[in-house]
Amino acid sequence: ALAGRQLPPANQIYASPLLRCRETASLLFPSQPFEVVEDFRECDFGAFENHTYEELKDDPAYQLWLDTAGEIPPPGGESKAAQKIRTLGAFHSVISRHSAGTIALVVHGGTIMAILESLEPTHEFYRWQAENGCGWLCAWDGRSLTVIFSY
């Protein structure tokens, strides 16, 4: 479904280090190299990583994490606030290298949600729920972000 999708051209592409994002970047921008940005990786879910809801639903630590909407970190993992600080730092680092032009970020849903919530604070984190393969075209003027459209 992503291969052949018509996207605006990008002067530079940045991707999470995880394989699924690197593969997606290659599908979306087949003739362009991309730069891997370590801090664009998804949230570290610690002890919950690679487990399903069914496997975790009776775990009190998991229930507490769900009840707080991820505000407390999973055991051995990263809090939503820590992820937001990390990903927003990476975003500002990438943006600071570009005074003009178009960049593309091929990253995870939680990474997108953290960046968009931070830069468009009229909508909270879960308002930016990102499905697989979705994206936003945004304009950045150095101070604020304007969403032009989503797909």
Language model features: what each stretch is:
Residues A1-Q32:
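Active-site-proximal alpha-helix that buttresses catalytic centers in soluble enzyme cores
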Residues A3-G4, L88-S96:
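Generic structural signal for well-ordered alpha-helical scaffold segments
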Residues L27, A114-S118:
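Active-site signature of alpha/beta-hydrolase-fold catalytic machinery across serine-
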